[in-house]
Amino acid sequence: KKSKIEKLYYFTVEDWKINRGKHLNNIRNTFSSNIIVRSSSFGEDSVDKSEAGKFLSVLNVNPKSNTELSRAIQRVINSYNSHSVLDSKNQVLIQNQTKNVILSGVLFTKTLESDSPYYVINFETSGSTDSVTKGKVSNTIKIFNNTKQNQIPSKWKKLISAVKEIERLTGNDSLDIEFAITPIDVIIFQIRPLTTVRKNLSKDVIKFVGNKIKKNE
């Protein structure tokens, strides 16, 4: 396998209102260390625009504290409401918080302006994923999709290899991928198809890729 997907748990806003206790118990039993509570909304990235950072993500949440966890989840849900994105099918994602991050960012498998075959990598080297979740990455590099592996800068070889695997597994070469790089792994946070029709498939795609990667282990 070329990348790692952090353990993932998710639910809709509607289901949270109905089954809050069940989800708190499931999260407490699923995660042993600090987590990040993330948004996954119909209002997030598409081929026409990026909404990265529009909705809240909460870092350093203790999964064993019902009070802290409930507050973090509600803050994410409130961020939907504050932007008038009130669809009850909006989701909340719970993931392990990645440690020892060297750099993190967002990669587009095509240029948004002209659909050109370049990997566009927007990244930060602060050592935190906070810039990604807030949509504040400030460095950009473009790498031609068909660049030979030995010609790719060493800093990006593992990431590009992981992205090519994801493209192959999904059968989709128009993707928006949130990632982090640690000394050991390429971590994939979210995968969104770059299409105006399929805006909210991030958790479905990421589960599909995760299952495929596990089968190849």
Name these PLM-found stretches.
Residues 1, 5-12, 28-60, 83-99, ...:
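ATP-grasp fold ATP-binding core
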Residues 1-2, 11-20, 47-50, 67-73, ...:
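Conserved divalent-metal-coordinating catalytic cores
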Residues 77:
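Catalytic core of tubulin tyrosine ligase-like
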Residues 56-59, 65, 71:
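Glycine-/small-residue-rich beta-strand-loop submotif within the FAD-binding core of flavoenzymes
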